[in-house]
Amino acid sequence: MTEGKYSNKRQINLQQAGNNPNVKFNNYEILQQKYDIKTIHQMDSLLRATGIGYLPVEVKYGAHVSFVPRSDYHFSTANPQILEKLDYYLENTITNVIDHGDMLQVPVEGHHSGEAMETRLTTEDEQMMFTESLSKYSDKVIAACGGTHDDPEFASRLKETYISAIKPIYERFGIPYFPNSLVVEFKVPVMKGNVQVGSTSLWCVVMHCSGKPASKKLGSVEKTYDQGLGVIKKFNAYFGKNVCPDFIIGGHFHANADCDYMVERNIYNKEGKATGSYMHTIRVRSNATIQDSNSSSFNRSFPDVLIPSFSQYDIHYRVNSNFNPNGMNNSPKYIPVVTEFPILNKSGELSMKAKEYMTNRKDYNFTEQVKKDYSNADFKTLYSDFENGLNQ
């Protein structure tokens, strides 16, 4: 029988033991382990050099970028009812999820103003609860980053404790985890009717943020903006790019606030000559928290932070019919259409928009195309790729 393209058979290499010609062993696992270790070492070296993770995400089926950024769950001190509602939404909605810090409370005695003593749950208890929650929608979590509570020091004991607690959970589900910041590039097809006419990239800077909260909520947004610009400048310098982010998403401050910043961007033709400019929107979003009322000094800084503010983002691009590739332009070739809405309302229930999105973003038209693409694949490959594609 001919071995198919998607065969899961592997080559077994029987290596003869040097000290006993009658003993043989299979060194495949050893070679694979060495390969994995070298790959991880190279990736970690890049992360240490830049402090920034980079994740390209291809929107494979459909033309919408869909994602939910989550931070500051502080799981063991979070409101159980709100946790349950968010789990239900993520489990039943076609969307990507990005975690960016303080998902666990990680009680550490002697740190963070005695906050560690406000819960009777241990770190092991919290890990078990978070693992159970994550297992419901782990296939939708494309990456995770950050998590330093209120300590920005790179080698702080608190950060070390957090990473040690949460990294194994993400690795268990195959979710890439970046200790610091993350730049996500969504590669988006652009459609005109039912025909793909091009592609573009949506850039998101995702991080946890650090430092004390400002006296006003908008001040925390400004800190998020400044820290996000620092990340993208370092990213551009290291990779030789000229990326201007579409989103800067942070947490840490529990600010429940957002602001749009306008920056001027040039438009270039195929020869690299500037043929105009336009005002580009950088959407800066600072998450709230779902901790109970007195579990954080940040909560006392901003009394309304307990209003759930986790949002669903949906972005697609439309073709600019007025764009002239050979002339001057004051708007880009592809224009983003951004939809965002709160997943929960102020009562802690699923919002009407969230219910509608959860129900309607189920495009079954892709099913036949996927079956055609993977007609010779085993079921596991078909299911995994199909789910991953839809989730993007």
Q: PLM features: residue spans?
A:
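Core catalytic region of metal-dependent phosphoesterases/phosphodiesterases
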Residues: 53-64, 70, 75-178
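Conserved beta-sheet core of the metallophosphoesterase superfamily
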Residues: 201-205, 210-324
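Beta-strand-turn-beta hairpins that frame and shape the catalytic cleft
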Residues: 56-68, 185-205, 277-282
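An acidic, phosphate/nucleotide-engaging active-site surface
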Residues: 155-207, 211-219
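Acidic, histidine-bearing metal-coordination/catalytic regions of metal-dependent phosphoesterases
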Residues: 1-69, 392
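A short C-terminal boundary segment appended to hydrolase-like catalytic domains
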Residues: 305-392
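Ligand-binding grooves and catalytic loops that recognize ribose/phosphate and carbohydrate rings
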Residues: 7, 11, 112-135, 228, ...
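Active-site neighborhood of phospho(di)ester-bond hydrolases with catalytic His/Asp-centered motifs
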Residues: 68-72, 96-102, 141-148, 177-179, ...
